[in-house]
Amino acid sequence: MRLAAIDIGTNASRLLISEVTVNGEGVPTFSKLNLIRVPLRLGFDVFETGEISKEKKHMILQTMKAYAHLMNAYGVEKSIAVATSAMRDARNRDEVVRKIFLETGINIKVISGDFEASLIYESHVAENLNANNNYLYVDVGGGSTELTFFSNNALVYKHSFKIGTIRLLKNMVTDADWQEMKEALRDNLRGQKNTIAIGTGGNINKIFSLSKKKDGKPLHIDLLKDYYKEFSSCTVEDRIRLYNLRPDRADVIVPALMIYLQIMKWGNMEEMLVPKIGLADGLVQHLYAEATA
């Protein structure tokens, strides 16, 4: 079975096309056939003006048309498309969603932050982890950060905070926003031992690649602090030149590190696992679960 997931984020949109094969015991394996990322950067419009501009509307439409062609070319049987923080906040989101549906047949669901947090966990990372530990999923995006806390393999807490990389770049995160996150972490992680962070999102994936760590090995908080100092001390142009970062990654990587570091500090966590999965992976698994229910 071929499935596809479209994630229209605040910084970029992604199309993930996966092949699902099932073994004799009925256990599915998900193989990535293609992942296409387009830096739409919707948040720069929405967080300033409250709506998606004419230029960005054109960009999204062209991107969705390309995605529709690719899904046809790959013979995708079922697909799902969601939009997150920037689209949630856009006054003209219904108009944009309707136009895309009429011209491409892609039906975009604008999902809540809490549902976004649950979908990250659908990637089933925790199934392969030590049940004696507690895990805090930290998904940092352009418009929001989703926190999902598991203890003894059970969901204890999940919440979406309006703290994201583009909001930080635009100075749109208040002290009250940070305080809300700090108190949530203190309240829910108080007295919990052996809590390990699991980081998802394009920025932490990039840091993991730069670190040259082997898959499955954690990033220590001190290493993240070093990267934060290093990137903060140079210009966006230097980050592009010295670290081979894309322009749409080079400006958001510092605020992303700031968010991860604050969360690790407030949650008393020293290590972060980076499974290199994201919302699109969770969406594909969610779609498969629905298709086979």
Give, region by region, the residue ranges found by the protein language model.
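Conserved ATP-binding subdomain of kinase catalytic cores across diverse folds
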Residues: 27-44, 72
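Helical "lid/coupling" subdomains associated with nucleotide-phosphate turnover
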Residues: 45-74, 78-134, 149-293
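Gly/Thr-rich phosphate-binding beta-strand-loop-beta motif of the actin/hexokinase/Hsp70
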Residues: 1-30, 124-161, 202
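Acidic/polar N-terminal loop/beta-strand segments that form early-domain functional surfaces
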Residues: 18, 41, 84-85
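A general secondary-structure boundary signal
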Residues: 17-19, 35, 95
